[in-house]
Amino acid sequence: MPSSSLWNILKSYQSVKKEMGGIRSLIFGPEKGDVGGLRAKYGQPPSQFITLSNGAKIHLRDEGDPEAPPIVFVHGHSEDLHTWNQLVKQLVESFRVIRFDLRRHGLTGPAPDNEYRIENYVSDLSMVIDHLGIDSFALVGHSMGGRISVRYTMGNPERVNSLILLSASGAPRKEESSPPMALRLMKNPLGRFLVKRIWSRNMAKNTLVDMVFDESSITDEEIDRMWDFSIYPGNMDAMFREFADTWEDFNPKEIRGIANNTLLIWGKEDSICPESMGSWYDSQLPNSTMVVLPNIGHNPHFECPDKCLDEISSWMGTLS
């Protein structure tokens, strides 16, 4: 990492010194959140907590008519099940909607085995589905959740009746431009050390701003939630453990083996998973349709939920 970048990070400590409690926070990092308080704030009904066979306690919501067609949502990095709120509000009228907090995210918290490879996430997804007794379903994944959904579909094609990927990671990145600074820092041991010690609500806000095209769409509620879950005990350390490893991109051969009908939704202005990554998926998947949304960044389901719903409904109608 260039020394100028590290210097800029160090200087940013001055702007958050008061918020983080000064020298103590620089040494130890931000205060940890209160689990009971966070559960009271974010875990009210229809939330439930289930225990998987691997011992993980998963925060989950299962809404809509139990007899309706099921649709399962898998959120992205540093998100949680609430990221789907705008889509779920309308989908519960026609679907059984399942969403949950991945390991090290939201109210699920760190995993008992402290492992954060893609195989662990896929295993959790599989166990959640089995726990709920679902045979086949539509699978929707965003960003990292899209990558997890792709990997799950590779191993369980008969269970996924349709696959919807929003700004999914896992494709090769060809742009000469770099990902946002926060992601670059996470790949560097010194960067992770610094982030832990200068992390603040303002930095949580900046992380959200990187995910959208129009930053005015970011609400205080969204910022508070990212901040709250980032200081959930153990979540940040688990994130650093995950970023210390490298998740390999998919190769064309394994992607071409997915015959499931797939919808790709991408923001034209996505700087985290650029449009070219969606085009790569579209070129490799044998039964894919790609929609590119202008003036939208990395979080189309948050930035333009109505447009996403229109695209999903229209596409699903072609499968009937």
Where on the chain are the PLM-derived regions?
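Conserved HGGG/HGGXW glycine-rich cap/lid loop of the alpha/beta-hydrolase fold
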Residues: A56, E63-L107
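Acidic catalytic loop of the alpha/beta-hydrolase fold
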Residues: E269-C273
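Conserved alpha/beta-hydrolase catalytic His-Asp/Glu region
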Residues: G29, K174-P179, K196-G257
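Flexible "cap/lid" loop of the alpha/beta hydrolase fold
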Residues: M154, L163-R192
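Alpha/beta-hydrolase fold catalytic core
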Residues: M1-I71, S94-F95, D135, M316-S320
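Active-site loop/oxyanion-hole signature of alpha/beta-hydrolase fold enzymes
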Residues: S53, R61-E63, L102-M144, D310
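Short beta-strand/loop motif that positions the catalytic acidic residue
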Residues: I258, L264-W266
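Catalytic active-site module of serine/aspartate enzymes centered on a nucleophile-bearing elbow/loop
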Residues: S288-S320
